[in-house]
Structure formats: structure tokens, C-alpha cells
Amino acid sequence: MQRGFNEVLSSLLFPCILLITLFFLSDSALSKDQGGQKKSIAENNTNTQNQTSPNSQQEPVKLKTITIEATEISAEPIQKLESRELRVHTGETLGKTLEREMGVSNLSYGPGVGQPVIRGMSGPRVRIMQNGIGAHDLSALSPDLAVAFETMLADSITVLRGPATLRYGGNAIGGMVDIKHQRIPEKIPLNGAAGRMDFRYDHNSSDKSGMIGLDIGRGNFAIHIDYFQRSSNNTRIPGAALDEAAIRQQFQVDPETNSSKVIQNSNANSQGGSAGLSMIGKHGHLGGSYHEMTRNYGIPPGVPGHTDGTRTSQEAIRIDMSQRRYDLDGLLKTYWPSLPKIKAKLSYIDYDHRDYDKGITDRSSSLTQFKNSVWESRLEMNHQRGSWLDGVFGMQWQNRNFSATGIETFTPSTNTDSLGFFLTETLFITDRLNLEVGARIEHQTTNPKSNEVRMAGISAPLPLPNTLNYLTYSLAASLNYEILPQTSLYLNWQHAQRAPDVQELFASGPHFATRSFELGRLNLNAEQTNHYELGLRFAGKHASFLANGYYKSIQDFIYLENQGFFFNFAPDPPRFQQTCANLRNCLPVFGYQANHANFWGYEAEITAHPRLSSPFSPRLTLFSDYVRGWFQNGALGDVPRLPPLRFGGEVGFQWMQWRGGLR
């Protein structure tokens, strides 16, 4: 396996080395080409100066800012937050930042988590990326784990659904979120330096946060540095923290503890920073960066999950995470019209977090550590054929080492390799009609690092396979027609496949942060999704409109199902049983299942923003979105954990540089 790993790594490093070589050769050739012109340019400058009065000076002229607005003809459901809109909506988590976007919800397992949910999909079906490379935290593993990124550092956040997601792998089957930042500078700052500061305060939880970023450039080099810090107290609420009636319904007993007016253990703090260096030329850039962050947050107490005689009555699970990230990024603009641009990325991410219970006196003995070390690289080559064809061919490779050690080792250590190739093409049939098509093939190999796993409550070890292989493919097509100026109608179709993640295959133990005992399935097949979508968009000078409807059918949809019994820690040895006599000793058992599921939903938004002659500009928005999922087997009912129907309105205004709103 190590030999195969080295071979794949070498083959993928070659494109990066090639890109670096071409970068230097291109700039070198450009310098030689410009060298012969320097003399004539200097002579022209001298002649110009001779025609100018010796006492005259060149004064800088300040030009009036001109804003150009245009609507791109595309069939992709894409949303982008940037500049002022991003600053206004930035929240303490990624899910909180994006929850106002159509079709996006916030999966909050407490204020410190906040994962994005796209059209009801989350976890391993939504790929979170930073500058086109996976975030590679463990947020896809469990809903109690936060995305390892501070939203204040983002320059833009893009949410993408539909056919274009096939460029990013099976884990983007439900959608993709790409966080852009200038950690690796792509241009020299104007006047040699630029910076940004952002300080925020939230009254409810006394959330105090701030960041500072600085870009400095000279000649062909630019550097970037930034730092952030965030701290919050427990969240205040108007009533009780726990729904005692719901606990009685599931466990048939009364809860032991509850809190009023505040959610206990919901405080959090985080800090981190990054530095990047880039060499920038007329034909692209080449740079690298380092980023590090730490985050400590609590999971609000619910039903107590376990006892060992040393814990207190008030459960307080906390998560202490850290991540170190190394990125290389290169862009080459070539001389060839048919191959105008080549991009290459290589990243290494080292992530770990520890779950611990503040109620245990000996904290060190209760620590459970999760580690996720990932190499990922991408190579993309843009190609064109005149004005009628534009496309991208690329490859993506990833190697992941995952491990969990401690009393909460509910998933064994594994190594996962994946290699994918993709091709997307846009055919401009007429000025008003275009067709986008794409295809991807990907091979994933998952290797447990042990041939067996021992599970609490079962005396005999469970055997594990040496290797699990999945070959998946995706196909997509999108048609976009501009029926009227600024108005387009689009139709999307996609067939996508996703290989099961490690926790879906190998889970076999307690997970105290989610108050559950999880069981995986080794015989899971790859998910297969067929997605259909019809939408209408209008973007005018004083108003905009978006409406779409979609339907998707997913074969072998993987989900966690309550098994109807409990895992009891009190007996020696622990055992599975049908009822729970003491909440402190029990965990409900959830098992991964696969069944055929169907989804349908819609998104609609209309905005009026008349531009008046005065500095005052009003804005009115009406919106609604909805998703429903159900299993084809009627006895199973609806798909669990879907966001509810949402509708509402927003009234806003802008006066000069001030803006406000009510939603």
C-alpha cells in the first residue's frame, strides 16, 4: 500500500512541478521579449518629457468609480457572498453565515458548531472547501463537529448546487461550499500595501471577535498575514433548555437536570492566524501559505450519556480542536489560445480534536482523540475552441489517514485513497442558448488498519475486510436559454454517485457528544442520485427574481436509524437491552441503513431595489424555500433531520455608507 501511495503521489506531483517550470519559463521568455522593447519605450518617454514644461509635474488624477452590472448566462444554481454582503451576514460559524441564502439552513448542534445544510443535505454529502481544496476537518463525520474555518477571514463564500459539483467529487453530491481567501496573494496590492480590520460584538452571548489582515507587495512578490480571535459566553434563552416531554417520550423517564434562561456549556473560544507568500508575474502566480487555528466549544447538555463513578450530575461534553494547513497554489496563463489557463493545487491538512467531559475529575483519563491527516491535489486545464466551446479537464487525488483513540473509539483507524478525473464543457449554441455537460469517474479504496474491531457489549471481536473498493461515476447536463433580456430559463439533470464514508461503514461504539451508540454497515453500496431541476431567473436594474423546483431520487440513501433499543453501561460487562431504567447509564442505539429515498423542493425569492435620486435606497425582499424527503418504502416514513418550510420578508435601506434592515 505504501508503494502505491508513493506512485500516486509522484504522478500527481509531476503536474505541479511542470506548472512551476512553465511559470518560470514563461516569465523568462516574457522578460526577454520585453527587453528588446525597453529601449524604444525609454526613447518614447524621453521624447514625451522633452515636450513637457520643465516646471510641470504629473499629478495623480482620481477617476470616478464606475459600476458595471451584468448577468452571466449559466444554468448552475450558484450563490456568492462577498464584499459588503459578506461582512453584513458574517456569523460565528459557517452555517450561521449562510443561513439566509436560499436553500441553505444552519445545522446547529449548539452555537459552537453551525454546519451548512443545502437542500436538506449535510455531512458527507456537502463538500466544504477552502480555495478549491477540502477543509478536511471532521464535520462530515458527525453533526457535533464544527467546520475548521473562521468566517471573518473569508473574502467570498460560494454555494454551488447541481451539475457543476461533479468537479469536486462524490462528497459534493448534495452541494459545495467554497471559502475564498487571499492567504496566497494573486495580485500586488495597490500602492504596495492593503489591510482590513473587523471587530464584532453580540449581546446575547457576549460574543467578542476580531480579525486583522495585511497584504504587502513589491515587485513580483507579495505576502499576506492575518490573525483572529473569538470568545463567547453561554447563550441566553427565554425558557428551559431541555424539552422534558420529548425526553419522557423517548426514554420513558424524567430528566435528571435542566437549566432555565441559559444554555449551559454553550460557550466557545477560538483563535488562529496564517501567513502566505506569492510570486506574481504577467502569466500567473505561484505561492504557498500556512494556517493554524484552535477552537474549544461545548455541546449543550442533553440526556446524560454514561457514568463511571467519577462524573458529576451535570454533563458537559467539550470539544478541543486544532488544525494546521499547508497550501501550494499555482496559476499559469499560457500563450496557447486552445489551452489558456492551467491551475494546480497541493495541500496537506493535519487536524485533530479531543472530546472530554468536564464532569470527570480526572480529565486526562477521559480524553478521546480524533486525528485526520490528508493530502489533496488538483490539476485543472481550461481549454477553448473559438467562441463556441469552453471547458475544463482535471484530476483530483486525495489520501486520508483517520484515527480515533480513547474510550469513545466508535470508528477504527483507516486509510482512504481516491483518484478522480473530470471533464466539463460549455457549448455556446447561440447568443441566447448554451449547453453545459460534464462527466467524472472516481476510484476510492478504504483500508482499515486492523483486521478486527472489539465493540463494547459483544465479547467476540468483529472481523474487518482488508480493503473496500468503490468505482463511481457522475454525468450531468444543463441547458440555459435567455428567453428575454436579463431573463433566463434553465433545466438541469445529473446522475451522481457517492462512496460511503468511514463512519457509515465501520462505526461500532459510543459517541457521547451526540448521545448515541452508532453501528455501521460493511455491505453498503455507493449512493446513486438522479437530480432534475427547472428554474427561472430575472436580474433587472430595479428588481430581481429567482424561482426553481427540483426533484431527486436517491438509491441506497444512507442514514442513521433508531434501532429501538439501548446500550447500557451499568452492567459488567455492558450490554444491549430493550429498555432504559437510568438515563445516566444508557445510550440509544442508531444504525446506518440504506434505502431508496425521494426528495422534492423549491426556492423562490423576489427583490425590489429601486434606485432613487437621493442617497436613500430602499430594498424589499420576499422569500421561501422548502424540501421534503420520504422513503419509497412507505413504512419507513419521512427522511429524518430535514429543515422545515421557510418563508418571510426583509425590508432594508441604504443611506450613503449606512445600511440597515428588518427580517
Model-derived regions, located:
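Extracytoplasmic beta-strand/coil segments of soluble accessory domains associated
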Residues: G95-D137, D155
